[in-house]
Every structure is written in structure tokens, then in C-alpha cells.
Amino acid sequence: MTAPLQNSKPTLQRLGGNRAAVFIILLTLHDFLMEFMEKKLYPFKFIPVASKRPWGGHDLMKKLGKEFVECDEEGNEVAISADELVGESWEIADMGVEDSVVKEGWLAGNTLSELMETYLEKVVGEDVYNYYGRQFPLLVKFLDIHGKLSVQVHPDDEIAAERYDSLGKAEIWYIMDAEPGAKVYMGFNREVSAQEFYDRCHKGTVEEILNVIYPKKGDAIYVAPGTVHAAEGGLLIAEIQESSDLTFRLYDWGREFDPATARQMHLEEAIDLINYGRFDEGLYRKGPLWGDEASDEPCKVPESFYSCSCGCDDEHCTCGDDCTCGCHEGGECHCHEEGHECHCGEEGHECHSGGHTGHHHHHGDRITETLVESPQFNVTKINLTDPLHIYTEQFATFIIYMCVEGEASIQVPTESPDGHKGMENHVLKAGETILIPAQMDDFYLVPRDRQTVLLEAVTRPVDDVDAYIDPMTEAYLDDEDYEGLEDGLLDDDDEDVAEPSGASPLGFFGAGR
């Protein structure tokens, strides 16, 4: 049994050998812990953590109303001044060194990793837990980029696992605000060679070959692993990514050549991680401010990240052995054996390949817009104009909501022991994030402002289990002689088989941006 959570740690006094008293206390403690564990989880808000960066600004505190604290030299908590350059607000993180702390409710003061250790699949869902183990799979931040973000790149899952024993870092940027002249550098404006890129990093001429985007509020950009990227000039961004901080700094706009501003660089280490082709515009989704140029399709994830084995021709199909390519209004979505046509298992339910795979949003009047569907996460933009009733069982995973505009409330139906029914209310303001655990049955999203926009992020359940963490994996190797060793191995039906100890390891901390 895992250790009790912070708020349930009693202090046992020495009882002078009184065994009866000790027994009574232990029995009471057992009953308390059993009742504690049976309490149902609720929506979690976490205390945001500031990350100071030379390219940061003041908007996280001034525009989003963030209040950050840090420890001084004596270990005392002090408020971070609004004049400090803060580049990131870590909203939800299970990263070892950075471990989000629950802000409210009866689990306040406990960390996300402690929740994962204690409640396991009740937090993330059974399929997600079976694959990721006790590692929470996503990292969520708000970014304030006013200076120049370094030119950088992130690895994919395969390389990250092989070299760093970590998850890779796919991410999506949602532009909450963009000042005139703000830029995002994303990929290259033409195909380049590794040698040319290397030389330009040393000569300070990298900008000439970078693809430049002038983003507007409401735009979304999928930052695929291997994509060289940077930004500058006044951007407020909501970022959803894999639970990894593997960042390789390639060029730092000349700061690396000044001893006063130099930071660690990783050009040689990352030279073979980079996609040197021309930037795929399908990774950039223009928002409503572009008018007729606005994108109707989600960001196109590179084909190399698909694991489609059913033969679907649709470019957005992300089905593995089971098709999960966008069934709406319930029903099991799968592929025909003949022709590989995607359809819903229940009659009368419309199936949209590549659409939002969760609940009853109305696509006709653009209440929801799919921003990206990838093996690592799906992100949907919700223009919340009317209350929505959400059934979490249709997701089979946790749900994260980031409020990027306006204000909403998450209302959870409750019932007291005497049968009295009520509603528990959780307010979500612009710049706030909330985690809906998989254990919750249903809830309502209710707008508190006419212009309320939410980002909804889920991790797509994975059917297979990483053999690295699967305790049920066969211990034998082909063509090996195990005579005499069989008795020391567990049978398949042995009740003492250990539970998973954790999946992809805790996020590896890179050098940051």
C-alpha cells in the first residue's frame, strides 16, 4: 500500500507498551484511510510555478493575474515582483523537480506525483495508466515571450527513449494574444543541409533560412518533434505538450557569444534530431481573425507519427488496432474490413474521420474546433456559448481545460449521504487551468462570460503496453536454455505478480528555453 497522502499523516505518540491502545489506534487509522481512499476525486487546480527567462515579460502577472512566489536565500517564500521577467507559468507538471501542488479541496497541499502514486488509474484512466504508469503524460504551461526565444528543437519519443530514457516533446502552441510585429519562427523556408545550418548557427545568419509566421490571436501551431523553432516580440501562448522538458538550444541570437549572457548550447548533440525539410504549412492553423483565410482543418500531424494499421485512406486516421478516428454522439467507431470505410457502430450516429472523439459538441455552429489530433494528445478549442453536459466515460481518460478567454464554471453533481443532491462549483478564469480526473462521472461546462474560450486536452488511450514497464511481459528469450530456472519464475496466474512501477520515466529536465 502506498504511503498516506500529506493531509492524512497522523503522528503516533509513544504509548508505553499499551498494545491495546496501539491496536485501537491502528484500527482507527485503517478505517480512516479506507474512508479517505474511497472519497471521490474532484477537479484539481494547481498552484502555478513561475519560470524566469531572459526572453520573458510581465503579461502573465499583469494580463492573466498570476501571483507567483519563490524561495529566498533563507528558504522563505516571497512574492515575485511584477517587474521580473517571467517567461513561463507551469500549470500542471509531474516532472520530478517541478511537481504541481494541489491548490484547493481536501487534497490541497499534495503533489500531482502523490496523486498518481495513490490514485493511479482514478486520475488518468485505466488505458492511459496501463501505458504511462505513474507518470502523468502531459505538461501544461502559459508562455509570455517578449524577448527572443532561443532557436531550439525537441526530440521525438523514440530518440528520447533511446538516448535519455524519457518521453519526447511534441507540443501545440495556441496564440492567446499577439502584439503587432510579433513573430514565430517555425521550421525552414526551404530545404537546407545539416552543414549549412551548423555553419549559420556559428556565423549568426540562421534567421535568413527560418520560416517566419506573423501569428494572430486564435492561431494554433503544432510544434512537431524535430522542428526548429523560436519566437519574439510580444506573444501570450497556451502550451500543451508531452511530459518532458527535453529542449536543445541551437542558436541564442548572439547571447551565447557574450560571457555575461551565455547559456549552455546543444547544437552538436541535436544536429541529427532536426527535420531539415521546408516547413509544412499544414502544421499551422490560422484562427478566425484571418477571415476567409482561416483554417477549417486541424493541424496536420506528420505521417511518421501515425500508427494506422487498418488501411484507412483518410489522412487524419490515427487508428491502431482499434479505430478511434472521430466518432461523435457515442457509438464505437471502427473500420470496415472491406474498403476500410470509417463508421460508427451504433445506427444513426454520424462519424467524422479526424473529428473530436469525445462527446456531443455541435460542429455546425463551430462550438468546437479540433486543433490537433496526435498519438500523444488531442486538443480541441471550445467556444463556450451555452452550458455543455460532459460525460467523462466517453473519453476514458482525464481531461484538462485551459481558459484562454472569458470565464467558465465547472459544475459537478453531488449527493450527500442523506440523498440530498446539489452542485459543486469550480470557477475557471482566463489564464487558469483545471484537471478533471478520469474517475469523475459527469459535469457541466457553464459560461460566465459571453466570450469564453476553453482548450480541452486529452491523451488518446493506447491499447498496447510498453514492454519496458509491463510486468506481465514474458521473461523468456527465444532459443535460450532455461533448464533449472523455471521454478524461480512466476507463473502467468501467480497472484504475486507485481503492479506496474511506473512508465516512461519522470521527465528529464533539459536546459529549458
Regions found by a protein language model. Give the residues of each.
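Short, often N-terminal, low-complexity regions
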Residues: T11-A21, H30
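Transition-metal
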Residues: L26-V192, D252-F305, V379, A475-G488, ...
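Ligand-binding loop in jelly-roll beta-barrel domains
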Residues: Q135, L143-K148, D157, L167, ...
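Glycine- and acidic-residue-biased ligand/ion/polar-headgroup-sensing regions
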Residues: I145-K148, A170-E171, I175-F197, T385-H420, ...
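Loop-centered beta-sheet repeat module
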Residues: C201-L250
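Short acidic-glycine-tyrosine-enriched beta hairpin
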Residues: L210-I221, P413-M440
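Histidine-centered metal-binding segments
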Residues: Y306-H363
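Generic C-terminus detector
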Residues: E407, G422-R513
